[in-house]
Amino acid sequence: KLVKLIGEAKELGVDMFLLDDGWFANKYPRHSDTQGLGDWDETADKLPNGIGRLTEEAKKQGVKFGLWIELEMVNPKSELYENHKDWVITLPNRNEYYFRNQLVLDLSNPKVQDYVFDVVDNLMTKYPDIAYFKWDCNSPITNIYSNYEGKNQEKLYVDYVRGLYKVLDRIKAKYPDLPMMLCSGGGGRTDYEGLKYFTEMWPSDNTDPIERLFIQYGYSQVFPAKVQCAHVTTWNKKAPIKFRTNVAMMGKLGFDLNLHDLSADDLAFCKQSIKEYNRLKPVILDGDQYRLVSPYEGNHTATMFVDKQDRNAVVFAFDVHPRYNEKLDNIKLQGLNPKATYSVREINRADCASDNNPKTYSGQYLMTVGLPLFTNNDLSSRIYELNQQ
């Protein structure tokens, strides 16, 4: 089944297949979130040929292979917990409190730091074609007490973070080119220090495209698009696939979908979107971002990306829930060369057709008069590409 999914990922046009939670543990197989966390060996019944069979298939298909891990956590129903209960943050003489059926490992303890590093190191040594890790963290620190810290319990929070950074420093030193996503029950770990170790971050588990317009707008005030993971999912199916995909194209685009649930037209649109995204990625991920219209200020929102030479730009425009016959003004663009001339055309259209009649404007006109980016259509969106002539 997984081999088939890797083939479908290749057909879709994405460059990486990520195997998420559920691939590990044998004594207590990870059939649910109640067990197995901490035992990072492949479940033999699920993966009789190991991760290597999947990395080989991904390589054959020309797709990178990524893997989900949550190394800071442990389920009480696991071999790790049975063998090293003293490695777990738990209050003595108190009932344990579980968040998502799990507890937190004590990363202030050097032995735990070694264990966490060794999991990554062993996976990379055994399966060097692993190209990406999704590093998850789905629980706050509960039952706050360290068996390692002894009388210095007041240092635990700080020493925990320092211990985590020591692990990440070791991973970075040995695998400097290994991309990793930082995820924590959504965006709970989104911070600047994380950028030293992680190539991207997961802003929120809420992937409703309407909510994501607000989330990504706020996120962009602090972090650039190139570290913002944005995926197309099944949340809010009232929003057309075009709307959902266009929202996700404003960050690091991904798809969390069963392709068999898509119509032929929607599948064709997703394939087209990936091609357009790959072509425009340098502008979106490495260009300057301009927030033209805030989603907090009305029924529409628009964001613009301009490359460093002011030659190429991409404008995303969204109509969320416009009012009937709402008055729509032109939106002034930003970041262009006022003396240059730009061609403007709509791309990534729902009919998958090309706009063969681009219009031409001066940068001065686009920034002082603007363009009619919005419509009165509910949950509609458009992407415009600008190229200097």
Question: Which residues does each PLM region occupy?
Answer:
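Conserved, mostly hydrophobic/aromatic
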Residues: F17, A58, V116, M180, ...
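Aromatic-lined carbohydrate-binding/catalytic grooves of carbohydrate-active enzymes
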Residues: K1-D118, Y127-Y132
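Active-site neighborhood of glycoside hydrolase catalytic domains
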Residues: K46-G50, V88-K242, K252-L257, D261, ...
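C-terminal beta-sandwich/jelly-roll accessory domains of carbohydrate-active enzymes
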Residues: H321-Q389
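Flexible loop/turn segments at secondary-structure boundaries
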Residues: W23-R30, E72-S78, S139-I144, G187-Y192, ...
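Catalytic cores of secreted or luminal carbohydrate-active enzymes
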Residues: T245-V293
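Carbohydrate-binding surface patches
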Residues: S294-N337
